[in-house]
Structure formats: C-alpha cells, structure tokens
C-alpha cells in the first residue's frame, strides 16, 4: 500500500512526519510523492494561526477530491486542539491528535476492518507524558539532519494555543539523543539541527539543560555543526552563552522570538521579558559571537495594540538590526485569553501594520546580507538547485552561492571557505579560497 504525507507548520512537524514515514515503511507501506496514487493520505496539521487552519481545510478538500477512495488521516496540532471541529470534517476518516502517532498504521488497519466508519483517537494530556521518540527518516538528498529533542510548553502566552495542543514540557533522554546523533553521523550527516516546541526548556524535567544536548552533539564523532531551532529569550543566560561560545561546532544562529517590541504589549501577551532585557541578551550574544545572526518573529495586531504601541514595536525592531524577521498577523485562537478580549484589532489595521513591518524586515535582511561582504566564512554546500551555482550556508545560516564550473562537480555535504564579494536581497555571492587564507572574524 502507498502512503502520502502533507505537512503544515514548523520544523517539529517536519521531524514528526519523517518519523511517521519510517513507522509506515516498517509496517510495509511505500511512501509516495503522488497523492492520487496513495491508499492512505496523512495531513500533519498546524494551528498556530487561523490562516494555517484555512490552508489545511483547502488541502484536505483538494486531496479528497483528487483521491476519493484513500483513507484520509488528520493528525497534529489542529486535531489535538480542536477535536470536535476536526472530527466534524466530512473529508477526514481518521482523526488523531499529537499523541500515539507510533500507532497510526494499526489505527488505519482498525479503520479498514471497521467498515471504514469514521474514527477519532485524541487522548487528553495529563501532564505526566514521557517524550515520544519516533524513528528518524530523512531523504537521501538532505545535507543537515533535523532532530526533535523536546516537546510541549509550560508558558501559556495569552495568544498561544500550543500548550493545549502539545501538553507540558518533556525532553528526549540523553542516551536516546546519543544514539540518534551517532546514527545521523554514521549516515554521513555533518550538521545537526536540534528542534523543539520550547527548545530552551530541554532537560528541565530532570534538572538538565539545553547545553547538555548541544555538548553531546558537538562531541559526537563526525558532527561538525550543531544548530538550534527557535529559542525563548528568558531561558538564554550569560553562563549558557559562555558555554556555547566555547564549543567550536556550535553554529551562532539565534532565533529569539520577540513577538513585540513594545513593553506594554509584551506584558499583555504574558511574555516573560522586557525589551530592555531582550536587547541586553542580543548584545551579550554579539559580544561572544562577532559573526552571528539573530532572527526573530514579530506579531502585529495583538488585541489592544495602539498605533503608539505599534510604532514602538517597529522602532525597537529596527534598532535591533535583525538578520531576518518573520512577520505575522495576530489571529484569535479559541480557548486562549487573548481571543476573549473585546479590543480586537480590525483586519485593515492589521494589514497596514503587516506591510510596514514587512518593509522593515526586507530592509533589515538586505542590510544583514550586505554586512557579510568582505568576510571569509566556512560554507556547508547542499543539493545543487541550478546549473549556474553551488549553494550553501555559513554557520550563522547566511545563504551563499558560488559560480559553478562548466564541468560541474557536486560539493554537497562538503565545507569550503568562501570569500563573500557581493550580496542582494536574498543571498550572498563569493568564491572559494584556500583554508590557510581564511579569517572569518575580519573583513579584508
């Protein structure tokens, strides 16, 4: 039987989809990239925003219309957070939340043996769950390996549905992490990206820390780069930064979710830091990592956000000189405190603020890439995407292109030093230089 996966949302979802693919393959299924050829179609959903829900509904209808006889499985955050709404979707045969996904093949078989009567399997979180270790499975053409090591969130920001969809914080045990990373290294991966719903809370249950995971990965033979996913600012201490700076394999790319550059809005969001604390953290990072990238998420249109609040947020974002900003509109999530507020912002105002913040984001991105001109940096090359260039990324995840020779040889999974000579709004351009001539901390 053939199985097709459609994934929405974050890198954690992508990791989980890879795990589910491995589980179905072990059960005798073949993974297909053609939904019309699938016997089972699985949608791994996201529900961070209403637009994500809308895209999921559209995809569900389209996939059902294209393959009426397939078993349609809806899983992930939307199913867990809104089980009644998910179960009411006529296109969905089997609805399963964010737990027990290792049982999916058995649940599909149970559905088929039960006269294809619609099924729902969404156990509630109790707060005592252990970390679910799904097997890893990556396409052979991938350069970096993404590994989910943490799940759940204890923060309950006023706008966020994720604690309800994912349960409380829990972490992959270190012995399991060692096995996973060693296996990736044996498969030829030189870069590991550690992911989680609230990654900076890794190890909190047993008194450990994210540093434990990063150090373990850096010490694994064959692993040359260790990168982190999104981080909560309040968990990043100076001691942690000092320890990370002492690890040569650590990649200085920090995605620190800001959400707003206005202190009043941050307080209303139930965020646990001020703009002053956030700015101090960024300064501490830059003092330890002279060549680094700090990226962020910024929400516009949170309930009660005034024009003055937004102007403050815009000005703060500009002052931080981010490498990249992901801008998104607030959307009410049923069951969260912010959704109950009477001072919701109109769609037209959200749109205006979105445009203004995106313009700033584009300017900041172009300026960041331009700041790399003159640097010589190690670049891990990836799958060739066009005939004219080799493509790769620096440790701080700056995208780099170098011209390809006429008789193009693949550089994939190799690291070379590149002198950055030009940039545009999307990437940097340069040429390979001998390692002996490389100096990544100074411009020539």
Regions found by a protein language model. Name each.
Residues 156, 160-167, 199, 226-234, ...:
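Conserved strand-turn element in the central/C-terminal portion of the radical SAM core barrel
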Residues 1-201, 215, 239, 244, ...:
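Proteins enriched for Cys/Gly/acidic motifs involved in redox and nucleic-acid/cofactor modification
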Residues 209-261, 267, 272-279:
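Acidic, glycine-rich loop-and-beta core segments that form the ion-binding/anion-interacting portion
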